[in-house]
């Protein structure tokens, strides 16, 4: 029952206005007493709280105010950072339900926005690479890759490397490095002297001796082939210069014609015994071809 009905007294003959005024005064007095009692009780509760709990409550309120006023960043906050903040504020979450609800909302937003969805600008755009990633020391430069069939040959001549530019003419390269023939001849002479020395041969085994002989043979054949190419180049140069003396337009020989010119020059400058050997070799070769064309060779 309300306070108004409790204070009603039976058999009162006073005026209604006076009763109403007294009633209002009594209500206001009771209300002021109640407020004073509540203030005293709240002060007593604050006195019983420790400084640590008051400090935690103050930090929570400051964080809430800072997050309300903080501008929204485009970059989302990672979930690991939020988990660390949970560990720090475990006590405050247990005490207040409001704080727990606040952190739950933040975690939901982070899980929603935490995953970065890659977006492609254009299909014709160049490849993007992070500047934070270290560049490897060994890189595949486009245009300089070694094909698979030539990867076994690791040691290549730098004169024919693609990085130096276009491939030059072999005649120009030969002129530049023709002085190396002297070193090759000296090396061949030294190797021949070693193979003729009996003391040196007694110190090495049979395998090393065969290897040295094979190397000497290959060096001689390589040097001879270089000299033969130089001779053929000079022959063709003289022939073309004689042919184009009185011509306004320069005429160049085909490969088949070049081969015939070189063979003719060599045959003319051979000795009699060498010519006989060459003619005998060609005759045997021709007879062998004719013999293979007989009918009994085609039987199965």
UniProtKB/Swiss-Prot annotation:
Stretches with biased composition (Basic residues): 114-124
Task: Check the record and name the InterPro entries matching this protein.
Answer: RRP36
Instruction: Report the protein name in the record.
Output: rRNA biogenesis protein RRP36
The record describes its quaternary structure and partners as: Associates with 90S and pre-40S pre-ribosomal particles. Interacts with CKA1, CKA2, CKB1, CKB2, PWP2, UTP15, UTP17 and UTP22.
Q: Which residue ranges run through the membrane?
A: none
Q: Which Pfam families match?
A: RRP36
Recall the taxonomic lineage recorded for the source organism.
Eukaryota, Fungi, Dikarya, Ascomycota, Saccharomycotina
Where does this polypeptide localize? Answer: Nucleus, Nucleolus
């Amino acid at each position: 029952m309300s306070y108004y009905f409790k204070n009603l007294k039976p058999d009162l003959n006073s005026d209604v206005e006076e009763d109403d005024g007294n009633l209002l005064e009594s209500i206001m007095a009771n209300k002021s007493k109640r407020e004073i009692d509540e203030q005293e009780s709240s002060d007593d509760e604050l006195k019983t709280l420790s400084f640590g709990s008051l400090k935690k409550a103050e930090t929570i309120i400051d964080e809430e105010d800072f997050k309300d006023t903080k501008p929204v960043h485009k970059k989302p906050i990672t979930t690991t950072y939020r988990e660390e903040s949970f560990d720090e504020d475990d006590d405050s979450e247990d005490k207040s339900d409001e704080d727990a609800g606040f952190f739950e909302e933040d975690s939901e937003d982070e899980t929603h926005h935490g995953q970065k969805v890659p977006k492609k600008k254009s299909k014709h755009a160049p490849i993007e690479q992070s500047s934070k990633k270290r560049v490897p020391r060994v890189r595949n430069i486009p245009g300089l890759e070694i094909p698979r069939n030539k990867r076994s040959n690791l040691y290549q001549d730098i004169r024919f490397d693609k990085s130096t530019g276009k491939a030059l003419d072999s005649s120009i390269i030969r002129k530049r490095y023709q002085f190396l023939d002297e070193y090759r001849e000296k090396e061949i002479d030294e190797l021949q002297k070693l193979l003729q020395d009996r003391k040196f041969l007694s110190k090495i085994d049979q395998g090393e001796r065969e290897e040295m002989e094979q190397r000497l043979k290959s060096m001689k054949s390589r040097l001879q082939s270089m000299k033969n190419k130089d001779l053929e180049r000079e022959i063709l140069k003289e022939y073309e210069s004689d042919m184009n003396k009185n011509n306004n337009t320069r005429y160049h020989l085909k490969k088949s014609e070049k081969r015939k010119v070189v063979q003719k020059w060599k045959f003319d400058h051979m000795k009699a015994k060498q010519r006989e050997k060459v003619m005998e070799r060609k005759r045997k070769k021709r007879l062998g071809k004719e013999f293979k064309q007989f009918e009994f060779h085609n039987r199965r």
